UniProtKB/Swiss-Prot annotation:
Gene: pncB
Organism the protein comes from: Vibrio campbellii (strain ATCC BAA-1116)
Single annotated GO MF: nicotinate phosphoribosyltransferase activity
Cellular component aspect of the GO annotation: cytosol
Free-text function comment from the UniProt entry: Catalyzes the synthesis of beta-nicotinate D-ribonucleotide from nicotinate and 5-phospho-D-ribose 1-phosphate at the expense of ATP.
HAMAP family assigned: NAPRTase
Post-translational modification: Transiently phosphorylated on a His residue during the reaction cycle. Phosphorylation strongly increases the affinity for substrates and increases the rate of nicotinate D-ribonucleotide production. Dephosphorylation regenerates the low-affinity form of the enzyme, leading to product release.
Alphabetical keyword list: Ligase, Phosphoprotein, Pyridine nucleotide biosynthesis
Protein's name according to its UniProt entry: Nicotinate phosphoribosyltransferase
């Protein structure tokens, strides 16, 4: 494994991002080339990152020097034949322009504290790749600024113990169908931590590890790149078509765009119940499976099985992919629960590349992974929303749009949730200390 958890430069390859970003970029370039969007970076952790602004900004600005090499272009063509070759060739000319697209601020919160804020604005097709890249930059800047003393051996020992325990449990429980992919890019401790982890897992768990969501590391380590679509695809459609039709249109156009090659549907942009109303027989047959990213995984899985059965579809011909903040133990329990009833697979992130166990610094402060997100907040000047199956994950900057969206999808209007959103919007009001 690695002897150093940090590199002198965080992003060293144009491919150091999650696979689904370039999938969506391809679809956006083909279908919505003129769409304008805005994204916002939000810190969910109770940790002030404002002092990291200069270093984060410096790393983001370095992206202007990153380009797709001919070797990388040819690699994408080889592993992603579902992408339009003309689109992939056009990546030769793609350039990040963070000076134009990305803004950095320090905000004063309602309680008087400060927090780092990052906004991304521009053409959807030109700004779509920033999300996972900027998140990985923030995470690593925070790690090397505040946790540089964490010994490599701490990370290694925690990972090795997890693998030992997993092997023991697989044998004890006689589980033979456990499959998972690495999805840690956005919230990794560092690039080197993710790289080291993948090298170790590919050696120790070759029959369980299906691949990684990171294109660069998939290429370097000979792993399968894993990824389909994210919430922003569905959120953008809320502003591009009639809002009530947005989810179904997004599903239909995605299916048509890739001829079924990227057939895992994300279910919780509006919520599982609203999703099932749109996921009709044609779509249920066309998509090979669905992905869970919020709410109770067991309740969700039972609903999906019941849905397939109601349409006369054998659930064993479909795959449920679970990606909501999992560790090995949680994934094993889900795997056992649905064994022989439906195919299952897992995406695991923070637990793999950002777990330091019980490590604490000299002041006795225990290490905790950073909780951060970047989400689309508007498309073509109109607000968009993610409702989610977990209220804490809901995102929308316009309370009236959220209420209308819920009404159109026949979702219950929770007054406490609405009050919480209003409080959050007030707390995140545009009160800047620094406009960098």
């Amino acid at each position: 494994m690695t002897t150093n958890l940090f590199s002198s430069r965080i992003i060293q390859s144009a491919l150091d991002f999650d696979v689904y970003k370039v999938n969506m970029m391809s679809a956006v370039a083909a279908l919505y080339p003129d769409a304008m969007v805005s994204y916002k970076f939000i810190v969910r952790s109770e940790e002030d990152l404002s002092e990291l602004l200069p270093e984060v900004k410096a790393e983001v600005l370095k992206l202007q020097d990153i380009t797709f090499s001919t070797e990388e272009i040819e690699y994408i063509k080889g592993v992603a034949p579902y992408l339009n070759p003309e689109f992939v060739d056009a990546l030769h000319a793609f350039r990040f322009n963070p000076q134009r697209d990305v803004s950095f601020n320090i905000k004063t919160m309602a309680d008087g504290t400060s927090q780092l804020r990052i906004t991304i604005n521009g053409l959807w097709k030109e700004t779509i790749l920033y999300e996972t890249i900027i998140m990985s930059i923030v995470s690593e800047v925070r790690s090397r600024a505040r946790w540089a003393e964490v010994p490599v051996e701490q990370f290694q020992s925690v990972l090795e113990e997890k693998v030992r325990h997993l092997k023991t449990e697989l044998k004890r429980r006689n589980i033979t169908n456990f499959k998972f992919a690495d999805m840690s890019t956005r919230r990794r401790f560092s690039f080197q931590a993710q790289r080291s982890m993948l090298k170790y897992l590919s050696k120790e768990l070759p029959d369980c590890l299906t691949g990684t969501s990171n294109y660069h590391l998939a290429k370097e380590l000979g792993l399968t790149p894993i990824g389909t679509v994210a919430h922003e695809w569905f959120m953008g459609h809320q502003a591009l078509v009639n809002v009530r039709d947005s989810q179904k249109v997004a599903l239909q156009r995605w299916q048509k765009m890739f001829n079924g090659a990227l057939g895992i549907a994300l279910t919780d942009t509006i919520g599982i119940d609203a999703f099932l109303k749109d996921f009709d027989e044609e779509l249920s047959n066309a998509y090979v499976g669905v992905r869970h990213d919020s709410g109770c995984p067991y309740t969700w899985g039972e609903k999906m099985i019941e849905h397939y059965q109601s349409l006369g579809i054998d659930p064993m011909t479909k795959t449920l992919v679970f990606t909501d903040g999992l560790n090995f133990e949680q994934a094993l329990a889900i795997c056992e629960h649905f064994q022989d009833r439906v195919q299952v697979s897992f995406g695991i992130g923070t637990s793999l590349a950002n777990d330091m166990g019980d490590y604490a610094n000299a002041q006795g402060i225990a290490y905790k992974p950073l909780s951060i997100v970047i989400k689309m907040v508007s498309c073509n000047g109109s607000p968009v929303a993610k409702i989610s199956d977990e209220p804490e994950k809901a995102m929308c900057e316009d309370i009236f749009f959220l209420m209308n969206l819920k009404r159109r999808f026949e979702q219950p209007l929770d007054l406490d949730e609405c009050r919480g959103l209003i409080d959050r919007l007030e707390d995140e009001g545009d009160n800047y200390l620094i406009d960098a």
